[in-house]
Structures are given as structure tokens and as C-alpha cells.
Amino acid sequence: MIEYLPLVLTGLGLTASILYYTSVLRNANEAQKRAQETRRTQLSTSITEKIGSKDFLRDFIELTQLEWIDIDDFLKKYDHTVNTESYAQRWTVWMAYENLGYLLREGLIDREILFNAASTGCVLIWGRYQPVIDYYRKRQLGPRFMENFEYLATEMWKMCKNRGYISPGYKDGFLFDTLHHIFEPTT
């Protein structure tokens, strides 16, 4: 019996080690999950503070109220060479969505966080300014200009559609119904 004692003690020691390391790994995983949740909360708060700030909202609202007949009219009234205030507002809003789109594309931000913080705004602004952005892509800034903003708006459009923000057949007069030709041009 005594000859088995070292084997039993070794087995008990090994079992204790395995249990200890399992406990350490479990605690580390729980700490990592808490840290991820904290980062998600901080990121969500940061995005909400940016997009919910008075300055951003003022710029956003003013961009939704600009009026133009066609691209030439837009350029005469709002191009950066004639209206630096409008340009600054556009750049502030567009770049916020461009950066959020980059984070989404790279998998660095949760799409639910973005949907809650930016979905309707980016869809509306993209829908309104897509022809202007296309003009700048073709004439001045190249095909990749605001590609992450476009990606974000397209992904948010899909989520809006899945959640009932867009009516079936685009015929119920919902706010986004008028934008379907931008996001689904073949329909």
C-alpha cells in the first residue's frame, strides 16, 4: 500500500493543479468579458456623446435642410470654394460616419451599438448626399471617397429594413421609403 502513496499523491497534486489552473482561466475569461463589456459601454457612450452633441446635431439638421435642384445648383451654393461653412458642416458629419463605417468594416465595433447610435442619421444623410458624393468621386476625389460611410449606411439600411423602419413595397410613406432607390436601385 505504501508503494502506491507517491502515485496517489502525484495524482492528487496533478488534480489540484488542473483545478487551480481551470479556476484561474475561468476567472481570466470572466475578467476579459467584463473588460469587453466596459469597452463596449465606453465606446457606445463616446459615439452617443459625439453624435448627440449640440454641435453635431446642429450641423446634421442644417445639412438636412439645404436645398438644391441638381449637382450644378449644389456646387454653386454649397461647394467648398463658395461656402466654407456648409463644407465644414458636411465634412464634420460625413467624416464621423466615414470613421464609424471603417470601425464597422474592420470588425472593431459592434453593429448593434452603431444601429442604436447612428442608424437613422447615416441612412438619411447618405440618401440625401449620395449623388453629391458620387459627383465628387467621379470628378475630384476618386472612387473610394467616403466608401466607409457608404458601407455604414448600406449596413444600417439593411438593419432598418429588417426592423420595420421601411415599409413593404416602400408604399406606406415611412421616412425611409423614399430612399429605396439609393440603397436598392434595381427595385
Residue spans for each PLM region:
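Basic/polar N-terminal segments that are highly enriched at the extreme N-terminus
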Residues: 1-5, 10, 179-187
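Short, solvent-exposed segments of well-ordered alpha helices
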Residues: 3-6, 80-91, 116
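An amphipathic alpha-helical interaction surface
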Residues: 87-187
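Residues at structural and domain junctions
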Residues: 14, 21, 33, 83-86, ...
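Long amphipathic alpha-helical segments that form oligomerization/scaffold cores
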Residues: 47, 51-81, 144-158, 162, ...
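Membrane-proximal alpha-helical anchors
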Residues: 2-73
